[in-house]
UniProtKB/Swiss-Prot annotation:
Interacts with CTTN/cortactin SH3 domain. Interacts with STRN, STRN4/zinedin and MOB4/phocein; this interactions mediate the association with the STRIPAK core complex and may regulate dendritic spine distribution of the STRIPAK complex in hippocampal neurons. Activation of glutamate receptors weakens the interaction with STRN and STRN4. The modification Phosphoserine is found at residue 1513. InterPro entries: Ankyrin_rpt (IPR002110), Ankyrin_rpt-contain_sf (IPR036770), Cortactin-Actin_Reg (IPR050719), Cortactin-binding_p2_N (IPR019131). This is Cortactin-binding protein 2. PANTHER family: CTTNBP2 N-TERMINAL-LIKE PROTEIN, FILAMIN/GPBP-INTERACTING PROTEIN. It is found in: Cytoplasm, Cell cortex; Cell projection, Dendritic spine. Keywords: ANK repeat, Cell projection, Coiled coil, Cytoplasm, Methylation, Phosphoprotein, Repeat, Synapse. Regulates the dendritic spine distribution of CTTN/cortactin in hippocampal neurons, and thus controls dendritic spinogenesis and dendritic spine maintenance. Associates with the striatin-interacting phosphatase and kinase (STRIPAK) core complex to regulate dendritic spine distribution of the STRIPAK complex in hippocampal neurons. GO terms for cellular component: actin cytoskeleton; cell cortex; dendritic spine; FAR/SIN/STRIPAK complex. Residues 119-276 form a coiled coil. Residues 1-27, 203-222, 366-433, 446-471, 491-611, 1440-1469, 1546-1642 are annotated as: Disordered. The gene is CTTNBP2. Residues 385-394, 576-586, 1552-1563, 1571-1588 have a biased composition (Polar residues).
Length: 1642
């Protein structure tokens, strides 16, 4: 249509009016378009469209009509015939439009109005149509939602009905079961009653049986006691009868012997011998090996001392000689000296054996006792033997002990010395005497502990520890019998033949009226008791050097220091040996190694005594005060202890002391031997020349034996004299083939060996068994002798009859110095013995690792035989060499020698494995050529015969050691408290063998993890081997093998139970896997295992914390600072985040640090911006929000969170809160369900208004004395140590363990002391101690770290806490603030720091005292002396009101050693002071202030005039009380180390609380009570006060700020005297009206 465009254009100018008027018009017509249906709307629309089209037609018609009318009006009245009209037309056409007037305006205006109205109606209808369409769409949508809700409602209703049916069924079942259970309960109750009745009956029966059993037991005990008593009586009777039988037999034998001797005497007298009558008896010299000197007058009395050896009988043999015998004549005042030998000193009746030569077993070579010293008046004392007045009756001991022992009579068995192998030639005993004579002599000689001595005196001896019954009864009868028999037997000059001394028998004692002979007893460990009447032991095996060659003589200890009291006890082999009385008569001397002048000298005229010292193995012997032989140190393990060991200085000596000797008639044990020379060589003769000349010329027939004795004893003087004689055969060998050089070398007498070698003695002469002197010296470990012999070209590869070389013997006895010398000399290591053993076999057989290392690694020098000049460097060099052995050194022995088999097919590995010598086996296994699979003749490998430990070692011989490490993943950097946590820790090394399967490998990994988790969570330092673990149970921290997320072998991932084609051994070698890494499950997997391992917080507790966060949404972690609150909150948030993300919810962590400037508005913005707080009209999103508020302690909880308490408790729209926006508008918000809030507070407890917030949150308290914090530090440091030691747990005595335990104790003690002081704000969590350095061998680093921690963290916190507490209740204007503390407050702080430092930190430090003192200065407050402090004086009576405390500020110097100022502190009172005046410090005007120094400079407390300390603070008083109790606490460690010296320690005053002051002044003239401090050396402080005033008024003493001691019971008068006489104290009587004192009130 032509009018479409015009008709459809709306007229917007009138639209608002029509729109406003439309509702009114619609309302008038009651026509509501909104109520029309869709079809009606369509009908209406079509009608309106038709109307519009009709209107268009009408408009067009009207326009056409208008045009016609216009033309008619304008041109109708004109025609062409009228020119006037044409002109008028033109005129009208040319005029302007404005001037023209419409011809007809009325119809057009009407049409335009109609058209405008139509346009408006069209626009209105289009708007209504659009609104109707939108409403229709909304209606359809709501209908669809309604239908969905109806369906859901139907489902829920159906489900509800179903649940109701199920619940009904369950209820019915429960009712039925309840009925059944009630019936069962009744039945069980009846049964229980029956059982209880039966139980009562059984109890009655049991009690009756117990009574009967007790009665029977009592009867049996009584019967057993009776039996024991009878048996004891039987034993006693048997011993008495046996002793009586032996006495009778001995008596009979002695009488027979006397008859035979008398017959021989008569025959000799008839022959007309020219010997003096009564002085010398004939004797055979052909078969004798003893020197006999017969004496007359009181009967020939002799003393004999021999040596007992240990019970080791391996190298012993039957008797081959008897020692040198010298009968002596006792004189009054000169009792004989019994020379004790090592072990039990056995003797024959008429024989004194000064020159005993024998071979002792291993135990005789073990000497480790220190020489004790008798007083100068003491006579000679030997090793285990008694001094004068006490005969030796000592049992054998593996360790020689000085004879400073009490005369205890004890008989402990030991083999007789002469039944042992004796390498020196000696003639057999006299063959004609009955062996029973010998037993009789041992029976009656010296068996009583209290027999009278020669002077008639009695030496008291304590009861013996092991005395046979014979020594307890019939003392008189025994004495008579002993005297009679001994007098008869002692007349004979030769010892009885074939009767070796019986074990346990005492040496020969003197008879008649001689003093009692005390016997000392030294228990032998492991020795079985042998009764006195038993026969001698069975002779041992044949001689040989397969065991340690023993010195052919007894061993006796030389007493080195004559200044020490002889009453000291010596501890040897766990047996205490008491010392004898020092009342020793004259006639004997004490031998000193270095100088004879140190010992007591004889007090009688020169009467020669015979003393041939037989020194074993290089012990010093003093001969003629000129000879000295050094004892060289050598280390010999086990029973093969070298006799020349530096620990043993032993001189075996047999001494015969006589008052009269006639050398001209003395005959030697060998024909022609000179007794005078023996006397001279003994070193006891005052005059040498007369004695040498008195005997006249003597033949040299017996000199070789004397030469051997001198060489064996180490008597350099005698040896040099003998070597200077002509015609002497220095290479003479005794029956066993032992030469003088052999004896000297075997006993380690280096000087004697040098003399003999210089005299051209044969160096390679061998004995009957083929052993050379070098063999003997090497076996005994005398490396100096070995060095000399090698220098003189001794055959270092000489093999004995059994094939033993010197190197073999040295290895057999573990003498590593000798081994080293021989190896450097180029000895052959491959020489084999008769049974196929090499030196390596010998070293392994004894388990000596050092010897084996030398054999395998020590290289001989290129230039051959080179001897060291300094043997003292041997041990150091050996240690260096052992270190090289551990490193890159290669063994020098070939594989054939290592794998050499003996006659039975055993290699060295077989021997080490079978004996369990794991260390030796490890050394052998280091040799690349070892064949552990080699089999012996029984087809057994070393593994077959090995012990368990050695089997494990052999199984792991070729194993690959792969470290197993635990990783917790990457720890995010940040301030979460995880700075000290380690990402990886080595827990152990896995041994992967060729036969290891993947199952075995998987089990090993699981077991290693389980062991490690349980080891780090255990309480003590126990190694993994000492702990029994259960692989199935979790550790106390909750970790197990199931906590593993993944395992990587090198870089290849692997899971438990997984198998590869290659074996683990091949897999590790192929892939070059250097380690096995175990990654624990962490927060990324929604687990907390890695958090547990990193922080050592038990897994169960972390899971509980996570449950609290998920359940309550609002959790706050609070505890002391450093309790890992931030770390725990962050890790829980990470775990919760990944759990939510795994469930399909997006999650975000928001972290905010709260400080003092953090306001509530900032917190609101934080919540709103992160969609925690959302408007009430807005629906929550699916996103989870976790908010962490850190450091809430820095702000007020009530102010910060007060408005959020309700909304946080209810996460819903039911608890909205209104907040204003920045533009001033307010809106309601609420916390939605997907919001979690966690907070951290570094505060031990809440105070004040913060408690109002407590009930609205879930609180997790991390107490320092409760889990998880209590054990966290211990577990963390323990794991740190295990990681440092590569998975091994060190022993508890390791310095690292002690250091870690000290650091742990410091943390606990610090918190304990701070808790006692009532300063919880100073408590410390374990975080600060996690960085404790673990450096093995460097405990100083830990102490330095502790000092830095103390200065940077602990001390400032303690100072702040104590100052805040001391001033918390101080009145304003009277006290000092913490920013400007007074001197008194500073004193309290310094005292507290000093007490804490000494009681909690320095106490228990593993450093030595000297090292600790060097580090003490590094600690702040460590040098504060507690002695220089002020204390409160007691208030004077009747002057309580406004009492003033006067403190003298002028320190005085002490007059003693110490100069430390002390204080005079009288209490002053002033009349007129108000009653509410608080006690203050005031200073005297006259006090000099010029000499004052600060506390920091002179460590003395000086209180200035301007600084006054208010004492009215209750908290301050309580603090001082706590300091006082901590100082005085016995349960705490000693704090005496706080002060500069012990005298400086001041105890805290134990007075009561602050007194209540009265305003009444009764006696203003009364002198003040004051407290005086006495000089520091007096250990007490004087107190002068009026006791009456205290009792009358009951005024309690004001508590002292710092510890000042007071005497417990000091009287006023005494104190007054002390104080008046003291140079550093004053007593001032002060008048209340004194003008010098002007108390002021601030």
């Amino acid at each position: 249509m032509a009018t479409d465009g015009a008709s459809c254009e709306p007229d917007f100018s009138r639209a608002p009016e029509d729109a406003a008027g439309a509702p009114a018009e619609a309302a008038k017509k009651e026509f509501d378009v909104d109520t029309l249906s869709k079809s009606e709307l369509r009908m209406l629309l079509s009608v309106m469209e038709g109307e519009l089209e009709a209107r268009d037609l009408v408009i067009e018609a009207l326009r056409a009509r208008r045009k016609e009318v216009f033309i008619q009006e304008r041109y109708g009245r004109f025609n062409l015939n009228d020119p006037f009209l044409a002109l008028q037309r033109d005129y009208e056409a040319g005029a302007s439009d404005k001037e023209k007037k419409p011809v007809c305006t009325n119809p057009l205006s009407i049409l335009e109005a109609v058209m405008a109205h139509c346009r408006k109606m069209q626009e209105r209808m289009s708007t209504q149509l659009a609104a109707a369409e939108s409403r229709q769409k909304k209606l359809e949508m709501e209908k669809l939602q309604l239908q969905a809700l109806e369906q859901e409602h139907k489902k829920l209703a159906a489900r509800l009905e179903e649940e109701r049916g199920k619940n009904k069924h369950v209820v019915l079942m429960l009712v039925k079961e309840c009925k059944q259970l009630s019936g069962k309960v009744l039945e069980e109750a009846q049964k229980l009653e029956e059982v209880m009745a039966k139980l009562e009956e059984e109890k009655k029966k049991t009690s009756a049986l117990e009574e009967e059993l007790a009665t029977e037991k009592r009867r049996s005990t009584e019967m057993e006691a009776q039996m024991e008593k009878q048996l004891s009586e039987f034993d006693t009777e048997r011993e008495q009868l046996r002793a009586k039988l032996h006495r009778e037999e001995a008596h009979t034998a002695d009488l027979k012997e006397e008859i035979d001797k008398m017959k021989k005497m008569i025959e000799q007298l008839k022959r007309g011998t020219d010997s003096k009558p009564g002085l010398s008896l004939p004797r055979k010299t052909k078969d004798r090996r003893s020197i006999s000197i017969s004496v007359a007058t009181e009967g020939p009395m002799t003393r004999s001392v021999a040596c007992q050896t240990d019970l080791v009988m391996e190298s012993a043999e039957p008797v081959k000689k008897l020692p040198l015998t010298v009968p002596v004549k006792p004189a009054a005042g000169s009792p004989p000296v019994a020379a004790g030998a090592k072990g039990n000193a056995c003797a024959s009746a008429a024989a004194v054996r000064p020159g005993v030569e024998r071979q002792v077993s291993h135990g005789d070579l073990i000497g480790a006792s220190l020489p004790a010293a008798p007083p100068p008046s003491a006579n000679r004392i030997e090793e285990n033997g008694p001094s004068t007045g006490s005969t030796a009756d000592l049992t054998s001991s593996p360790t020689p002990v000085p004879s400073t022992v009490s005369p205890a009579s004890g008989h402990t068995p030991a083999p007789p010395p002469h039944s042992l192998h004796s390498p020196c030639a000696n003639a057999p005993l006299h063959p004609g005497l009955n062996p029973r004579i010998q037993a009789a002599r041992f029976r009656f000689q010296g068996s009583n502990a209290n027999d009278p001595d020669q002077n008639g005196n009695t030496t008291q001896s304590p009861p013996s520890r092991d005395v046979s019954p014979t020594s307890r009864d019939n003392l008189v009868a025994k004495q008579l019998a002993r005297n009679t028999v001994t007098q008869a037997l002692s007349r004979f000059t030769s010892p009885p033949a074939g009767a070796p001394p019986r074990p346990g028998a005492p040496p020969t004692g003197d008879v008649g009226t001689y003093p009692p002979v005390g016997r000392t007893s030294l228990k032998t460990p492991g020795g079985a008791r042998v009764d006195r009447g038993n026969p001698p032991p069975i002779p041992p095996k044949k001689p040989g050097l397969s065991q340690t060659p023993s010195p052919p003589h007894p061993q006796l200890k030389v007493i080195m220091d004559s200044s020490r009291a002889s009453s000291t006890g010596i501890k040897a082999d766990n047996k205490t040996v008491a010392s004898p009385p020092s009342t020793l008569p004259q006639g004997s001397r004490v031998m000193n190694e270095e100088n004879l002048s140190k010992s007591s000298s004889p007090q009688l005229p020169p009467k020669p005594s015979i003393d041939l010292t037989v020194a074993p193995a290089g012990c010093a012997v003093s001969a003629l005060a000129t000879s000295q032989v050094g004892a060289w140190p050598a280390e010999t393990p086990g029973l093969n202890q070298s006799a020349c060991s530096e620990r043993s200085l032993v001189i075996p000596t047999t001494t015969a002391s006589s008052s009269s000797i006639h050398p001209v008639n003395a005959s030697s044990r060998r024909a022609g031997a000179s007794d005078s020379l023996l006397v001279t060589a003994s070193g006891w003769s005052p005059s040498l020349t007369p004695l040498l000349m008195s005997g006249g010329p003597a033949p040299l027939a017996g000199r070789p034996t004397l030469l051997q004795q001198a060489a064996a004893q180490g008597n350099v003087t005698l040896l040099s004299m003998l070597l200077n004689e002509e015609g002497l055969d220095i290479n003479y060998s005794c029956e066993d083939g032992h030469s003088a050089l052999y004896s000297a070398a075997k006993n380690g007498h280096t000087d004697c060996v040098r003399l003999l070698l210089n005299a051209e003695a044969q160096v390679n002469v061998a004995d009957t068994n083929g052993f050379t002197p070098l063999c003997a010296a090497a076996a005994q470990g005398h490396f100096k002798c070995v060095e000399l012999l090698i220098a003189y070209d001794a055959n270092i590869n000489h093999a004995a009859d059994g094939g033993q070389t010197p190197l073999y013997l040295a290895c057999k006895n573990g003498n590593k110095e000798c081994i080293k010398l021989l190896l450097e000399a180029g000895t052959d290591r491959s020489v084999k013995t008769r049974d196929g053993w090499t030196p390596i076999h010998a070293a392994v057989d004894t388990g000596n690792v050092d010897s084996l290392k030398l054999l395998m690694y020590h290289r001989a020098p290129a230039h051959g035989n080179k001897l060291r000049e300094e043997p003292g460097l041997a041990i150091f060099d050996l240690d260096q060499e052992e270190e090289r052995h551990e490193g890159t050194s290669k063994p020098v022995v070939p594989a054939d020698l290592i794998n050499h088999a003996d006659s039975e097919g055993w290699t060295a590995a077989h021997i080490a494995a079978s004996k369990g010598f794991k260390n030796c086996l490890e050394v052998l296994c280091r040799h690349g050529g070892l064949e552990p699979e080699r089999r012996d003749k029984c087809n057994r490998t070393a593994h077959d015969v090995a012990t368990d430990d050695c089997k494990h070692l052999l199984e792991n011989l070729n194993a690959l050691k792969i470290p197993l490490r635990i990783s917790v993943g990457e720890i995010e950097p940040g301030n979460y408290g995880a700075d000290d946590f380690e990402c990886e820790n080595t827990i152990c090394a896995l041994n992967i063998r060729k036969q290891t399967s993947w199952d075995d490998f998987s089990k090993a990994v699981s077991q290693a993890l389980t062991n490690h988790f349980q080891a780090i969570s255990s309480d003590g330092w126990w190694s993994l081997e000492d702990m029994t673990f259960n692989s199935t149970t979790d550790s106390s921290i909750g970790l197990s093998a199931s906590s593993v997320r993944s395992i990587t072998l090198g870089t290849v991932p692997w899971s438990a139970g997984q198998s590869f084609a290659q074996s683990p051994w091949d897999f590790v070698r192929t892939n070059k896997a250097e380690q096995v890494t175990v990654l624990l499950s962490g927060p990324q997997e929604g687990c907390l295992s890695s958090v547990t391992y990193a922080s050592m917080i038990p897994l169960q507790m972390l899971q509980n914390y996570l449950r609290l966060v998920e359940q309550y949404h609002n959790v706050i972690f609070h505890g002391p600072e450093g309790s890992l609150q931030d770390y725990i909150a962050h890790q829980l948030a990470l775990c919760l985040k990944h759990r939510q993300m795994a469930a399909g919810f997006p999650c975000e962590i928001v972290r905010a640090e709260v400080d003092a400037d953090f306001s509530k508005e900032q917190l609101v913005d934080l919540f709103i911006s992160n969609a925690c707080l959302i408007p009430v009209k807005q629906s929550p999103a699916n996103k989870k929000i976790i908010v962490i508020l850190e450091n809430l302690e820095k702000s007020s909880l009530s102010e910060l969170l007060g408005d959020f308490l309700g909304p946080l408790e209810n996460h819903s729209t039911e608890s909205p809160c209104t907040f204003q926006k920045g533009n001033g508008t307010s809106e309601c918000y609420y916390f939605h369900e997907n919001c979690f809030l966690m907070g951290t507070i570094a505060k031990a407890c809440l105070q004040g208004s913060d408690l109002l917030v407590q009930q609205h949150f879930r609180w997790v308290q991390l107490r320092w004395d409760g889990e998880p914090m209590q054990g966290l530090l211990r577990r963390f440091l323990r794991r740190k140590v295990v990681n440092k030691f590569r998975g091994q747990v060190p022993s508890p005595c390791d310095p690292v363990c002690k250091t870690v335990d000290w650091a742990l104790a410091v943390w606990r003690q610090l918190n304990s002391c701070l808790a006692r002081l009532g300063t919880p704000e100073a408590l410390l969590g374990p975080k600060y101690f996690l960085s404790c350095p673990v450096i093995p061998g460097h405990a100083q680093a830990t102490v330095k770290w502790m000092s830095k921690l103390w200065n940077a963290v602990i001390a400032p916190r303690v100072q702040e806490a104590i100052l805040s507490r001391a001033s918390v209740k101080r009145q304003p204007g009277l006290g000092q603030t913490t920013k400007n503390p007074s001197q008194g407050q500073q004193a309290v702080v310094r005292a507290a720091l000093s007490i804490l430092l000494n009681k909690a930190v320095l106490h228990g430090c593993p450093l030595q005292r000297a090292e600790l003192d060097q580090h003490t200065a590094d600690f702040k407050g460590g040098s504060f002396p507690l002695s220089i402090v002020s204390s409160y004086g007691s208030c004077n009576k009747k002057k309580e009101s406004g009492a003033w405390r006067k403190v003298s500020t002028s320190p005085r110097k002490k007059s003693g050693r110490f100069s430390s100022p002390t204080w005079n502190k009288p209490d002053l009172s002033e009349e007129g002071i108000k009653s509410n005046t608080i006690l203050q410090l005031n200073c005297n005007r006259n006090a000099s202030l010029s000499n004052q120094k600060s506390l920091e400079n002179d460590l003395s407390l000086t209180l200035d005039l301007d600084q006054r300390l208010s004492l009215g603070s209750d908290d301050e008083a309580d603090l001082v009380k706590e300091l006082q109790s901590m100082c005085a606490s016995k349960s705490e460690s000693d704090i005496s180390k706080i002060a500069d010296s012990r005298d400086d320690l001041r105890r805290f005053d134990s007075s009561g609380n602050n007194p209540v002051f009265s305003a009444t002044v009764n006696n203003p003239r009364m002198p003040v009570s004051q407290k005086e401090v006495s000089p520091l050396s007096s250990h007490q402080t004087t107190e002068c006060s009026n006791s009456k005033s205290k009792t009358e008024l009951g005024v309690s003493r004001v508590k002292s700020f710092l510890p000042v001691p007071r005497s417990k019971a000091t009287q006023c008068s005494q104190n007054t005297k002390r104080s008046s006489s003291s140079s550093n104290t004053r007593q001032i009587e002060i008048n209340n009206n004194s003008r010098d004192l002007e108390p002021t009130q601030k």
